[in-house]
Design a protein with these regions (language model features):
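His/acidic metal-ligating clusters that form di-metal
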Residues: 43-66, 92-97, 134, 148-189
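Extended active-site neighborhood of metal-dependent phosphoesterases/phosphodiesterases
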Residues: 24, 29-37, 75-172
Length: 189
């Protein structure tokens, strides 16, 4: 990332793309006939096209960052290296620098999936500063006994220790934004 303190930037937040290697009907207007498009094609031609248009609408030189809030992919039938490559290419096809939080569908309770995600996107727990904001991105999706993830989200003791150390080094005048995939509470609690 560029050095120095930015006083103004834009953060585009992407929620739950869940791009799959499956095919589904998508419509672009009520008059369209249903056509089959892959999720990757839909994400590239619709979602990323909208993001690129948003970036073009900003004043020239505005720093732009993206933050995917997890579930970049949805695996059906096991890990899919081609799908990972395609979503990385799609997400990297604009001028924005992208950060990504891991979601439950990015790992599906499999150590292999989590390792592959880390190889492709980086660590599952990290932080960065932009302007006067300290962003903390953390994995809060854990699977129990290889089964479905537990909701609400939770943190492991090692993460709490890391978070305390991270925040201790953060200037007290900075805002802190905690980024994670699933809610930490049930309902209205």
């Amino acid at each position: 990332l560029p050095g120095g303190k930015e006083t103004s930037y834009k953060m585009i937040v992407i929620g739950d793309p869940q791009v799959t290697n499956a095919y589904s009907p998508y419509y672009t207007s009520p008059d369209d006939n249903p056509i089959k498009k892959s999720d990757v094609e839909r994400f590239t031609t619709q979602t990323m096209a909208d993001i690129k248009q948003t970036i073009r609408s900003l004043p020239a030189g505005t720093p732009v960052y993206g933050l995917s809030m997890g579930d970049d992919v949805q695996y059906y039938g096991g890990y899919n290296a081609k799908l990972e490559r395609q979503i990385r290419q799609a997400l990297g096809s604009s001028e924005m620098r992208l950060f990504s939080v891991i979601g439950n569908h990015d790992q599906d309770g499999k150590a292999l999936y989590r390792r592959k995600w880390e190889e492709n996107f980086g660590p599952t727990d990290f932080s960065f500063n932009r302007g006067d904001v300290h962003y903390v991105c953390i994995n809060n999706c854990f699977f129990h006994h290889g089964m479905a993830y537990y909701s609400p989200g939770e943190l492991r003791e090692r993460q709490v220790k890391w978070l305390r150390q991270d925040l201790a080094l953060t200037p007290k005048d900075m805002k802190v934004v905690l980024c994670y995939h699933i809610p930490f509470t049930f309902g209205n609690a």
